[in-house]
Amino acid sequence: MAQKTLLIITDGIGHKPSSPHNAFTQAKKPTYDSLFASAPHALLSTHGLSVGLPEGQMGNSEVGHMCIGAGRILYQDLVKISLALKDGSLEKNPTLLGFSSRAKRIHLAGLASDGGVHSHMEHLLGLAQIFSRLGHEVLLHLITDGRDVSPTSSKEFIAQALALESDLIKIATISGRYYAMDRDKRWDRIKRAFGVIARGDSPTSLTPQEYIQAQYQAGITDEFIEPAALGGYQGFEPSDGFVFANFRSDRAREIVSALGGASFEGFDRGAYQPPKTLAMTSYDDSFPFPILFPKEKVEPTLAQVISEAGLSQLHVAETEKYAHVTFFFNGGIETPWENESRVLIPSPSVATYDLKPEMSAPEVAEATLSGMRQGYDFIVVNFANGDMVGHTGNTEAAISAVESVDRELGRLLEEAKKSGYAVILTSDHGNCEEMRDERGSMLTNHTVGEVWCFILAQGVTEIREGGLNQVAPTVLKIMGLPTPKEMDSPLF
């Protein structure tokens, strides 16, 4: 067999029955239609235990790309942290106890949601209880979600935090993730969340629930809740400690570096002394903070096997998904392997991606076409549209997003045939195939379900249903490379 291989990941395009709110089935997509008619295809599971998440938990881009790149199921931080809370080992964690001994008040920040993509409410509340049992006053800095869960669900999670309120546990600030969890160096957003958390800017006399209700009445949903300080909160004190409870790294880096970093260049923090800081996981290799759940080494990965075989590879994506085809795809390793090239295409600078549903797909495709013409042995490319436009809740824009991806797929498949590439086309998780629920309410979160996988390769006439963990072994089989014992079985 031994073919050069192109792996295409169409982010956020999954499988659900046809409906008016399924952007995938509603789109005009001649390339996909042709693949359904003539290419071997099967469904792959992208959620729950099949990708190392709790049963029934929706998949996400980080987990999906890690699973694809590792070629096996990796139990995710979400599962590990939940187990540590359940069995009591987190309370005895030496890093946590050491941090506790050095700090007075504890500022505990995180995404207040059970979406399980960046955080989980049970982790945030579990840590609050642990620190209060250790005698600390705990000040909660709640980041409202509205993206991985319903856009008006924050009251439910705030109620859970309020149920814990005591002499030691209080809600200090609220901020929408649009401000507190940017990942694209939009420092004006981070600065607003920083000001509220670090200094108690934008005070309100409203209770947490009253404040959320006032924001809703102003037409502002959870993702975009304006940062506010509550209950007379006035900011950090020199003896305080700051804990960030999100486990996913990409949207934690900016806010944690702003609040905890000794040196910081995103904006002028004025006369600022950062507090002692504790991170849930490893957000960035350059961060000096202690970590509750350090990164486990994931090897071998697909990229590693290809590199060690002396072959060349190219990883392509636009900004929104660049970390996914590099850092996450390579098992949490930032540095490229030998003979691994990378192309980053800037994502369009728009407030929300429904304003430009094609995003940077044409440029991503151009870079991939160039890679095939240069003869890279393996290319992985991500199209972000289905996910990023799906998150806006705009069905018409999501349909346009699918059509944009379909156009670029047509160009890539034509060049792949010309240049002798095998093609594996799949997704990391679903999103745009379910834009509204059965009641007609907008859905902005990922779906719980399967995605399609198509394979165009010499001698492949049929593939099995399976999981994302089987993609890497399938690539290696097509490329004529041995599959490491740590990886799972291929799809044919």
Curated annotation (Swiss-Prot):
UniProt family annotation: Belongs to the BPG-independent phosphoglycerate mutase family.
This protein's UniProt keywords: Glycolysis, Isomerase, Manganese, Metal-binding
EC number assigned by the record: 5.4.2.12
Active site per the UniProt annotation: S61
GO biological process terms held by the UniProt record: glucose catabolic process; glycolytic process
Binding site residues for Mn(2+) 2: D11, S61, D428, H429
Molecular-function annotations in GO: manganese ion binding; phosphoglycerate mutase activity
Binding site for substrate: H118, R147, D148, R177, R183, R248, S249, D250, R251, K321
Required cofactor(s): Mn(2+)
One Pfam assignment: iPGM_N
Function in brief: Catalyzes the interconversion of 2-phosphoglycerate and 3-phosphoglycerate.
PANTHER family referenced in this protein's UniProt entry, alphabetically: 2,3-BISPHOSPHOGLYCERATE-INDEPENDENT PHOSPHOGLYCERATE MUTASE (PTHR31637:SF0)
Name used for this protein in its record: 2,3-bisphosphoglycerate-independent phosphoglycerate mutase
Summary of subunit composition and partner proteins: Monomer.
GO cellular component terms given for this protein: cytosol
Pathway(s) this gene product operates in, as recorded in its UniProt entry: Carbohydrate degradation; glycolysis; pyruvate from D-glyceraldehyde 3-phosphate: step 3/5
Residues annotated as signal peptide: none
Recorded superkingdom: Bacteria
Bound cofactor: record note: Binds 2 manganese ions per subunit.
Catalytic activity: (2R)-2-phosphoglycerate = (2R)-3-phosphoglycerate
Top enzyme category: isomerase
Binding site for Mn(2+) 1: D387, H391, H446
Species: Wolinella succinogenes (strain ATCC 29543 / DSM 1740 / CCUG 13145 / JCM 31913 / LMG 7466 / NCTC 11488 / FDC 602W)
